[in-house]
């Protein structure tokens, strides 16, 4: 609503009183109401980029808005001095991390790789003197659940409420997560870490197959062709792997299938819950599924000689500390991976995920001194290259779909 000033020389309109200039100087000022970032005066979200008309805002809630108000004498507000980051003077100074976001993203990638490598190395060291993957899988999830419960207690983050409908959607996700996690650890305990990760490079193949034949989605021929090097590379590595055994191979394959169905059920269980709370609830559900088989398959052996043998080899303090830290590293690297995905584009995350697998395979070979044949090394390299090509093509297809939807 624009205000209009009637000059004293204008002709008066019949029926409308003539406005006279009041005594004293009237200064018209524009009052800028500064709200905190993202919040307005009532706590709602502010939609930036739109100017709210002053006449439509009733800042004084004790009285209704009057269409005709008496002129009020106000002092002229002196403009605030502009900050270094905003010439208008209405924004707070930009912090160092906000000014250089790539440093924060780089830190997330570093922590993701570091925690993942440490987890895989410590996990394999535990299996060298305590070969009970079902029990260790329970410890992984239990430490993470305790961590989540502690975080909820202090409100970092605030616990998201759940109802029976959400739980019905999350239970299949938690079951697939539990099955994939346990079978991965069975494979880690049975064969070399590098070989397990080479087999797990086939996971994109199972994802594509499930999308095509289970969900009925059309997979481009370019994606199928990019998976050929993955299958060939894993086959080459498996034929000459020195630590090969069928338990480790089949367990890793079941893990691939389980995580594929976890992805399918996750898409069906999409909620407005943030990733931290969502992963916490999935961990709790997965823990409940992991406890019965651990008690059934390994309980008697653990009580008979499992715990005593481990304590005799490394001592009780180291045994307990190893179990605690391997569980903590497992939870943190999964949480950091989720946070990293939220910060970068799918293409960047896909490349980072491939490089992470390369780091894990390389460091595990160096730390444990695993001897690999030339054919295994070539096959592993071909498989990793195929995963990289597949991830790049898939990420670009997803980006094109988002651009078409936004256009």
UniProtKB/Swiss-Prot annotation:
Its main location: plastid. GO terms for cellular component: chloroplast membrane. Residues 1-81 form a transit peptide. It comes from the Eukaryota. The keyword Transit peptide applies. GO terms for molecular function: organophosphate ester transmembrane transporter activity; phosphoglycerate transmembrane transporter activity. The chain crosses the membrane at residues 102-122, 135-155, 213-233, 278-297, 376-396. Residues 123-134, 234-277, 397-407 are lumenal. Keywords: Chloroplast, Membrane, Plastid, Transit peptide, Transmembrane, Transmembrane helix, Transport. It is found in: Plastid, Chloroplast membrane. Residues 82-101, 156-212, 298-375 are chloroplast intermembrane. The keyword Chloroplast applies. Belongs to the TPT transporter family. TPT (TC 2.A.7.9) subfamily. NCBIfam families: tpt. PANTHER family: SOLUTE CARRIER FAMILY 35 (PTHR11132). Mediates the export of fixed carbons from the chloroplasts into the cytosol in the form of triose phosphates. In addition, it can also bind and transport phosphoenolpyruvate, thereby increasing the photosynthetic efficiency of C4-plants. Homodimer. This is Triose phosphate/phosphate translocator, chloroplastic. It comes from Flaveria trinervia. The lineage of its organism: Eukaryota, Viridiplantae, Streptophyta, Embryophyta, Tracheophyta.
């Amino acid at each position: 609503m624009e205000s209009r000033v009637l000059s004293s020389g204008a002709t008066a309109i019949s029926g409308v009183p003539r406005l006279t200039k009041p005594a004293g100087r009237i200064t018209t000022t524009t009052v800028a109401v500064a709200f905190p970032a993202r919040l307005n005066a009532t706590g709602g979200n502010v939609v930036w980029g739109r100017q709210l008309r002053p006449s439509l805002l009733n800042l004084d809630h004790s009285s209704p808005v009057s269409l005709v108000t008496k002129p009020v004498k106000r002092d002229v507000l002196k403009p605030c001095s502009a900050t270094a980051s905003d010439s208008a003077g209405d924004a707070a100074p930009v912090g160092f991390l906000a000014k250089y976001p790539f440093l924060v993203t780089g830190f997330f990638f570093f922590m993701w790789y570091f925690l993942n490598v440490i987890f895989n190395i410590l996990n394999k060291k535990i299996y060298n003197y305590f070969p009970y993957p079902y029990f260790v899988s329970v410890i992984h999830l239990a430490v993470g659940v305790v961590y989540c419960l502690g975080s909820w207690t202090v409100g970092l983050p605030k616990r998201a409420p759940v109802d029976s409908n959400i739980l019905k959607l999350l239970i299949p996700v938690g079951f697939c997560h539990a099955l994939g996690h346990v079978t991965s650890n069975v494979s880690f305990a049975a064969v070399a870490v590098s070989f397990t990760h080479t087999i797990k490079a086939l996971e994109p193949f199972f994802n594509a197959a499930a999308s095509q034949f289970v969900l009925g989605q059309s997979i481009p021929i370019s994606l199928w062709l990019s998976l050929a090097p993955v299958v060939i590379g894993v086959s080459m590595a498996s034929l000459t792997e020195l630590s090969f055994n069928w338990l480790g191979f089949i367990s890793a394959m079941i893990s691939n299938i389980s995580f594929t169905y976890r992805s399918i059920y996750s898409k069906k269980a999409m909620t407005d819950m943030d990733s931290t709370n969502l992963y916490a609830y999935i961990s709790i559900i997965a823990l409940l599924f992991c406890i019965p088989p651990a008690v059934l398959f390994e309980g008697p052996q653990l009580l008979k000689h499992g715990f005593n043998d481990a304590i005799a080899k490394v001592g009780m303090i180291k045994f307990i500390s190893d179990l605690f830290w391997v569980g903590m590293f497992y939870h943190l690297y999964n949480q950091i991976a989720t946070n990293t995905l939220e910060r970068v584009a799918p293409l960047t995350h896909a490349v980072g995920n491939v490089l992470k697998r390369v780091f894990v395979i390389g460091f595990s070979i160096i730390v444990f001194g695993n001897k690999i044949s030339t054919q295994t090394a070539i096959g592993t390299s071909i498989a990793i290259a195929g995963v990289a090509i597949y991830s790049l093509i898939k990420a670009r297809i997803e980006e094109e779909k988002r651009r078409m939807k936004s256009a």
